[in-house]
């Protein structure tokens, strides 16, 4: 198994290190355009192997030839968000980067599974799929795993309980229009609405929607990377080990939820072939309306981007 991580910034490097620690690949390549950065970080990771008890071969490179025959490619490359900047502000800048990266990947790997992390996430996943020519099942955006984790953590914090006992489902685009579905949110099987007031749940939902921006505002420079990287690793692990995990990911829908041809976050089964099944869960009309509205925003941005490319 060979995995390549494109982008040696905080998200990319943290993802690579966690993948190496879990020994999900025999060979792991960390690639970046800046000379020396991926080489130095990869060597540092590799040297931690004797103490961390892993044997993953970690290589840093600036040459896409070193990514040849990758089974999975994680794209984290792109410009970071700055305070006050929405994911949509990044649209045109990062689309060019993702398009270039995907083209170079496909020159050296015939049929990889691509996991996109670059923002604006749903739109960049569309860009990568469009450029790659791969079946839609093999191009997946990391969004709902992270958004659901944030919602779960806020609920656990509110109740003072273990995060492991909280389950949540956050659908839609990875942005301000995401849809945390309260009816599918539980604590040890107990509906969260039985434990927290509707008013307080609404506040936690809003905090989840702005969770990324909250961290950006704290950091001043850069954005979240520990939780995003951990979310990517959960997805990759399900693919590599064919675990068939049901995770919320940004995938191209084919009529489910009344949405067609748009990448948006919904529950899917992830296995060795990528997206193996899309689950169409029953939603209240209000949540369905929000999901469709979220998808419409993604679709409009994709069409605007396609038009700008001529």
From Swiss-Prot:
Active-site residue numbers: 174
Family annotation (InterPro entries): L-lactate/malate_DH, Lactate/malate_DH_C, Lactate/malate_DH_N, Lactate_DH/Glyco_Ohase_4_C, Malate_DH_type3, NAD(P)-bd_dom_sf
Catalytic activity of the protein: (S)-malate + NAD(+) = oxaloacetate + NADH + H(+)
Residue sites binding substrate per the record: 81, 87, 119, 150
Keywords on record: NAD, Oxidoreductase, Tricarboxylic acid cycle
Pfam families xrefs: Ldh_1_C, Ldh_1_N
Entry annotated with the keyword Metal-binding: no
GO biological process, one term: lactate metabolic process
Residues that, per the record, bind NAD(+): 7-12, 32, 94, 117-119
Record-listed E.C. numbers: 1.1.1.37
GO molecular function, one term: L-lactate dehydrogenase activity
Function comment: Catalyzes the reversible oxidation of malate to oxaloacetate.
Similarity comment: family membership: Belongs to the LDH/MDH superfamily. MDH type 3 family.
Quaternary context: Homotetramer; arranged as a dimer of dimers.
Entry protein name: Malate dehydrogenase
Species this protein is from: Chlorobaculum tepidum (strain ATCC 49652 / DSM 12025 / NBRC 103806 / TLS) (Chlorobium tepidum)
């Amino acid at each position: 198994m060979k995995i390549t991580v494109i982008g040696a910034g905080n998200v990319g490097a943290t993802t690579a290190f966690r993948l190496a620690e879990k020994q999900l690949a025999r060979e792991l390549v960390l690639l970046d355009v800046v000379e020396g950065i991926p080489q130095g970080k990869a060597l540092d990771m590799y040297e931690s192997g004797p103490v961390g008890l892993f044997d993953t071969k970690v290589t840093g490179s600036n040459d896409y030839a070193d990514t040849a025959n990758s089974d999975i490619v994680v794209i984290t490359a792109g410009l970071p968000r700055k305070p006050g900047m929405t994911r949509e502000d990044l649209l045109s800048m990062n689309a060019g980067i993702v398009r270039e990266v995907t083209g170079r990947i496909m020159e050296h790997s015939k049929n990889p599974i691509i996991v996109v992390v670059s923002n604006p996430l749903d739109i960049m996943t569309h860009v990568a799929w469009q450029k790659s020519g791969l079946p839609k099942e093999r191009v997946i955006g990391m969004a709902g795993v992270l958004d659901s984790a944030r919602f779960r953590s806020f609920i656990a914090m509110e109740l003072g309980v273990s995060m492991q006992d909280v389950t949540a489902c956050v659908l839609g685009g990875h942005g301000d229009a995401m849809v945390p579905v309260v009816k599918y949110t539980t604590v040890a099987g107990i509906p969260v609405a039985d434990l927290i007031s509707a008013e307080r749940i609404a506040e936690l939902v809003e905090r989840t929607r702005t969770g990324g921006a909250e961290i950006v505002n704290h950091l001043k420079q850069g954005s979240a990377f520990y939780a995003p990287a951990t979310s990517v690793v959960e997805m990759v692990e399900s693919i590599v080990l064919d675990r068939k995990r049901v995770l919320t990911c940004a995938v191209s829908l084919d009529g489910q939820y009344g949405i067609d041809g748009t990448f948006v976050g919904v529950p899917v089964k992830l296995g060795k072939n990528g997206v193996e099944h899309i689950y169409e869960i029953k939603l209240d009309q209000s949540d369905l309306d929000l999901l469709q509205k979220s998808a419409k925003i993604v679709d409009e941005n994709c069409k605007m981007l396609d038009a700008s490319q001529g």
